[in-house]
Swiss-Prot record:
The gene is ppcA. It comes from the Archaea. This is Phosphoenolpyruvate carboxylase. SUPFAM superfamilies: Phosphoenolpyruvate/pyruvate domain (SSF51621). It catalyses: oxaloacetate + phosphate = phosphoenolpyruvate + hydrogencarbonate. Its cofactor is Mg(2+). Homotetramer. Its EC number is 4.1.1.31. HAMAP family: PEPcase_type2.
Length: 460
């Protein structure tokens, strides 16, 4: 049986350390040799990664005796051709197959077995990419005599309203395939930007439950990948203080992303704790999550979007100061859309968005505070904490970075007051340390945001 990776090293710009594309080749090898990651994701989604990078990683791995295609894989994330230029998607596929051409020629191994297709909302695009891969592979074999192997498409579903349909989408994507084992990627971050922390967290546990159902009904083994970062808003699976709890809350995953912040902004001991928590809890099970959560996901999303829409100008103002620590396309060119009725607003991508909220003294998990107070008053909050057993600890963690005085300079009194009232209800003391408070009192600038981020151990 083919080895399925457990730890996926990514190129997310969530660290305070600037990493250039030139450094990413060495970074990929270090991910295996120092951090124990058995997969590295070369990212082309909204990112100016050289198309020769997968091949360069292949050649470096061969020279370093890294067990390519056995214990170490390169996985390419291409742009979704519906959202970015079609040529960029095709060039990314070419980069993956060129890497396999060289790994097959020089190491008789297949370095790239999977490509990730982001922002999947239907199965047509997945099938298009799969068809293009197979046709390109046939041409390589017929024209060069080199079998670059079969490359599978991993659908990355990263919108709460689409994740709740994961069972249907996966069923359509793999219904005509002979595979007995498939990988499905669930992303927390972009879903949180669009729908808020509560809705996106509930959508993921519901999707995991439905994928388990699909597995039982189809006989196809599903290997879920969880895409999560360090802050609670982005899943906290990489957070040294929360990872051991999050692995229980999101039980059922097989692979987890190891993003940049946990590798560069924490100590090696802290990283090892995160890694061991993820590995030890892999493949655990949790009770089935029923359809009763769907109305709550809808309500939480609507309430969150209503609050976020009121503050779009301030978010954009602060987001412009958040530094880019990878060679990504600016969020102004490739951001995220937030829908509220007929209104569409252009938002930063998840890491910049999250960082901006922290810089305003208001962690983005607290945007749900008005709804949580409503749930508390109607005796429904305990049911939420039962579904998400780590949720209260996430809120307690984020209240360490909440400063009402700073937040009032940017946000409505209504939202800030709701966060204060929620802290009182939960019995949580909302008090940042004197050092963090002093940083919040300073004028916002790029160095100031970096300093705040270094204290938290993540940019966003």
């Amino acid at each position: 049986m083919m080895h399925i990776p457990r730890l996926m090293c990514t190129q997310h710009p969530d660290t305070t350390v600037k990493i250039t594309t030139a450094e990413e080749v060495d970074e990929a090898i270090v991910a295996y040799t120092a951090y124990g990651c058995d997969e590295v994701m070369v990212d082309y989604e909204g990112k100016m990664t050289p198309y020769g990078q997968p091949k360069e990683i292949v050649m470096k791995a061969i020279r370093g005796d890294v067990p390519l295609g056995d214990e170490f894989y390169i996985t390419v994330r291409l742009p979704n051709p519906k959202l970015e230029e079609f040529d960029r998607a095709m060039l990314s596929l070419e980069a993956a197959l060129v890497a396999n051409y060289f790994s097959r020629r020089y190491a008789d191994a297949q370095a790239v077995r999977w490509v990730v297709l982001p922002m999947v909302e239907d199965f047509d695009t997945v099938i298009l990419v799969r068809r293009m891969l197979r046709r390109k592979a046939e041409i390589y074999k017929s024209e060069t005599g080199v079998d670059v192997g079969e490359v599978e498409v991993i659908p990355l579903i990263e919108d709460a309203f689409v994740q709740v349909k994961a069972k249907v989408i996966v069923g359509e994507v793999f219904k005509s395939e002979e595979a007995r084992e498939v990988r499905v990627f669930l992303g927390k971050s972009d879903s949180a930007v669009r729908h808020g922390h509560l809705a996106s967290a509930l959508a993921i546990i519901y999707a995991m439950s439905k994928l388990k159902e699909f597995e039982a009904e189809s006989g196809i083994r599903v290997r879920p990948i969880l895409g999560m970062g360090s802050p609670p808003f982005r899943g906290a699976l990489n957070n040294p203080r929360l990872a051991h709890l999050e692995v229980v809350q999101y039980a059922g995953y097989y692979t987890a992303t190891i993003q940049s912040a946990v590798r560069y902004d924490t100590s090696l001991d802290e990283y090892v704790k995160v890694r061991e928590s993820i590995l030890n809890a892999c493949c655990g099970t949790r009770g089935l999550v029923g359809e009763e959560v769907l109305p709550l996901i809808q309500e939480a999303s609507a309430k969150y979007r209503s609050q976020a829409m009121k503050h779009v100008d301030k978010i954009a103002e602060v987001a412009r100061l958040v530094p880019s620590t990878r060679d990504r396309v600016s969020w102004k060119e490739y951001g995220r859309s937030l829908l509220d009725g007929d209104r569409v607003v252009h938002m930063p991508r998840a890491i910049v968005y999250t960082s901006a909220w922290y810089a305003m003294g208001f962690p983005p998990t607290l945007i749900d505070a008005p709804l949580l107070l409503e749930l508390a008053k109607s005796d429904k909050l305990d049911a939420v904490f039962k579904l998400l057993p780590t949720y209260k600890m996430e809120l307690e963690y984020d209240y360490e970075f909440f400063d009402p005085q700073t937040a009032r300079n940017y946000l409505s009194e209504e939202l800030v007051y709701a966060a204060v009232e929620l802290a009182d209800y939960l019995g949580v003391e909302a008090r940042p340390t004197p050092t963090y408070t002093a940083l919040l009192k300073m004028p916002r600038s790029e160095p100031n945001i970096i300093a705040l981020s270094k204290y938290r151990k993540f940019l966003g």
